[in-house]
Amino acid sequence: NNTISVLFSDCIYSVTDVNSQLDNAKNATTDAFLTALAKNSTMATIILQFVSSFDGYYYDRNDKPYVCKSPRPFYVVITGNRDALKTLYTDFKVKTMPGLKNKSFFTSESWTLNENNACAIISDYTNARRIKTQRNFLDIDDVSLDRNASSLQFAIGVDYSGIFVDDDYVLDKSNYQIEPDCFRVVGVSKASPSAIGDFSNIPSKPYAIVISVPNGSFAPMITLSLRKVIPAWVKKSNVNDDAGFVPASTKSFAIQKMVEGIAAAYSEDYDNYYKLTVDINKYNK
């Protein structure tokens, strides 16, 4: 229910045989989270990366000590009921805590988006002469193209207020998948004030996902999804082998393996946060 668990750790696996033991540790992490999720499917996890001053010894994977008097990263891993974590994150103003560098949210859930929380944006982000939506504000009836443009650009609005996902993750266009392949997500931003009026209901957390497609590659339907993938900051913070040195102040030995172990459990049932379909009836030249 409202009980949460908080782990403070450097999140460094204590292993010597990097090649075999790290994968075993990753798999054990996945199994532990799968076991917990089987008991409570609404259990979510937040991982916070902080950097603080440090004065002590850093031990590499061979347990060799190195004097370290420079900033080091540490992690706060919070698990519990999704709604309880959302309350904690807001009430404790986690986003503004000193030393916070990165964060990630994990949930086993996937959400359904429709005309109540998504729309085709007709006012901004487009080079079309006009976009006319159908009555549901999401599907497009017709697009009047700019004949001088080499591609069509437009945007889909999504209200993320009900989805358990980090703001920085939402803004990374590489986390999105769109079909057909000729369509591309070229940018993501908070929705402009005028775009908010394109929603059927006033959104609490509106974002605009900008899409581009070359002229001549149009399709009658597109499918947009926000994938559950390892956040970019995790890969940037990872060191595969720390033997013989102290990693940089924002990097940790094998942190990617630990996060991959957690993420694998949370993507077991759904590999996306949502999947949204938009029909486009007509393209007018």
Regions found by a protein language model. Name each.
Residues 1-285:
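Acidic, low-complexity intrinsically disordered regions
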